[in-house]
C-alpha cells in the first residue's frame, strides 16, 4: 500500500542545467569623488526620544534612540553606557537575512559604537544607559551602509537632545592597491565587480576636525592612506551639511506655534 501523503518524483529525470551568471554591469554614473544624494528626516518615531531616517539612493536606514535612562545593572557607573544594535532587515540584501543577529551585525554594532561614543558627553549621565537601534531597510554595499549608519545614529542622538561636543558623520572609499583607482561612496556593484581589495571607512567630527575612528583594509602606503583620508574627510563634511540643515529644519518646526 503506497503512502498517499508522500510526493513521488518522476521515474525518469535529468539533472538541471544552470546557466553561467552574467558579469555585473557597472551602473555608476557618478564621478569617483562624488557621493550619492542624501535625504534625512528627523523625529519620525513619536514614541522614541530621538529618531532619524537616512536615505541615499538605494540605502535606507532607520534609527531610534532611547535614554538616557537608569541602567538595569546594579553596578555603579560614573558615566552612561552606550549600547548600539545594528540589524539588517531580512529583505535588505540580495541574500535573505535571518532574524538572529549575525556575527557581522555584532561587529558593525561595535564599530558604530566606537565611532559615535567620542562625541557624546557620557559623563553627564551617570548610572544611565543610552540605547541606539539601527535598522537597515535596504543596503547597497557594506562600506557605504556602515558609513551611512554612523551618520544616521549620530543625527538621531542629536534629535534626542543628548549633550554632545560634535556630530559624527561617516564616509567610505574603495581603492585598488595595485593602481591609483579609488571610488568614494562605493555601491554594491563597485564592491563586487571592480578589481579593488582595499577600503577605508571613517567617522569624522567636522566642527572639531577630529577623526573618531578609521578602519582600513588592504595594502596601502602612508602617503596614499593620507590622500584617501582627505577624500573621506571631504565627503564627511558634505554629509554634515545635510545633517545641519535637517536639524535646523526640525528646530524651526518645534518652535512654530
UniProtKB/Swiss-Prot annotation:
GO molecular function (one):
RNA binding
InterPro entries registered for this protein in UniProt: ExoRNase_PH_dom1, ExoRNase_PH_dom2_sf, PNPase/RNase_PH_dom_sf, Ribosomal_Su5_D2-typ_SF, RNase_PH
List UniProt keywords, sorted A-Z: Cytoplasm, Exosome, Nucleus, RNA-binding, rRNA processing
Q: Which GO terms describe its biological process?
A: exonucleolytic trimming to generate mature 3'-end of 5.8S rRNA from tricistronic rRNA transcript (SSU-rRNA, 5.8S rRNA, LSU-rRNA); nonfunctional rRNA decay; nuclear mRNA surveillance; nuclear polyadenylation-dependent mRNA catabolic process; nuclear polyadenylation-dependent rRNA catabolic process; nuclear-transcribed mRNA catabolic process, 3'-5' exonucleolytic nonsense-mediated decay; nuclear-transcribed mRNA catabolic process, non-stop decay; poly(A)-dependent snoRNA 3'-end processing
Q: Which SUPFAM superfamilies match?
A: Ribonuclease PH domain 2-like, Ribosomal protein S5 domain 2-like
Any one GO CC term of the record: nucleolus
Localization per Swiss-Prot or TrEMBL: Cytoplasm; Nucleus, Nucleolus
Report the family membership.
Answer: Belongs to the RNase PH family.
* Described function: Non-catalytic component of the RNA exosome complex which has 3'->5' exoribonuclease activity and participates in a multitude of cellular RNA processing and degradation events. In the nucleus, the RNA exosome complex is involved in proper maturation of stable RNA species such as rRNA, snRNA and snoRNA, in the elimination of RNA processing by-products and non-coding 'pervasive' transcripts, such as antisense RNA species and cryptic unstable transcripts (CUTs), and of mRNAs with processing defects, thereby limiting or excluding their export to the cytoplasm.
Question: How does it associate, per the subunit comment?
Answer: Component of the RNA exosome complex. Specifically part of the catalytically inactive RNA exosome core complex (Exo-9) may associate with the catalytic subunits rrp6 and dis3 in cytoplasmic- and nuclear-specific RNA exosome complex forms. Exo-9 is formed by a hexameric base ring of RNase PH domain-containing subunits and a cap ring consisting of csl4, rrp4 and rrp40.
Protein name (record): Exosome complex component mtr3
Task: Look up and give the organism this protein is from.
Answer: Schizosaccharomyces pombe (strain 972 / ATCC 24843)
| Gene label | mtr3
